[in-house]
């Protein structure tokens, strides 16, 4: 009976931030797997994955999100779409909903800020089955 329980346990997805820029001291890429893997964030429950960014370009960066095993990457509908930085811990943060036309490999979100404005940023992705996927960013000033 214990074996059945272990078999039913869900394996965490491999979720990646794709960028050509240097994040956390590591040059990224737009391939899967990338050098920037998001980790499950149990404080949100469901299938939310997060990446804390403590070292980033001076005034902004661009990115897409990929889930290993999926043929298309999550991206905004238009290139350079701005992504709002929510204050850390914001209830109901402003997020970008991933609709059916938000998959591909040509567009990227743009995250902008002033130099030294944030101590760190956290990129969050909710890929919970049966809900609209979404991406949001929180910042600690």
Where on the chain are the PLM-derived regions?
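Bacterial Sec-dependent N-terminal signal peptides
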Residues: 1-14
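Generic detector of ordered, mature protein regions
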Residues: 2, 28-30, 134-136
């Amino acid at each position: 009976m214990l074996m059945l329980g272990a078999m039913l346990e869900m394996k965490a997805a491999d979720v990646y931030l794709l960028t050509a820029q240097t994040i956390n001291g590591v040059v990224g890429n737009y391939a899967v797997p990338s050098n920037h893997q998001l980790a499950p964030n149990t404080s949100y429950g469901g299938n939310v994955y997060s990446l804390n960014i403590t070292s980033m370009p001076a005034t902004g960066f661009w990115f897409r999100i990929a889930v290993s095993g999926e043929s298309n990457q999550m991206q905004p509908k238009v290139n350079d779409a701005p992504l709002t930085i929510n204050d850390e811990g914001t209830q109901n943060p402003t997020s970008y909903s991933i609709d059916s036309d938000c998959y591909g490999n040509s567009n990227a979100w743009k995250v902008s800020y002033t130099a030294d404005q944030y101590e760190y940023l956290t990129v969050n992705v909710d890929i919970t089955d049966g809900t609209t996927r979404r991406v949001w960013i929180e910042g600690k000033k």
